[in-house]
């Protein structure tokens, strides 16, 4: 399956993919470090083989295995100048991840990405990114988000809930 990653500039699309690339036994190098100004200016592709998927998702899947050859992630640029590349990535995908900075919320290219995905009839999930910037958030590098959330105080979770539901309207 092909997974497109779309969203506004600087909302962390390439960083999320770099994190995925760094997991598992077949670690790959960081793409963001090689991007001019840290901004994606072309469509990039990352393959995540089934064995890495199974390794990454084991804590969430309870030992179940993916019956898939793996995933091909397409990283699309978020800058307003690259609408055509976002549209191309969104229309190629079987599913998409719409990345939104939880502190910034929906921005122009976020809304444009939603329109692209709707027009292409590409199903998508929303990934709230930069959650670690919420005041009081206790980061646990390498932890699954669901586990990290259980470790937060009620005040921090109230702030998370407020920001999360603001994004969803």
Language-model segments: residues:
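P-loop/Walker A NTP-binding module and the surrounding RecA-like catalytic core of P-loop NTPases
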Residues: 3-169
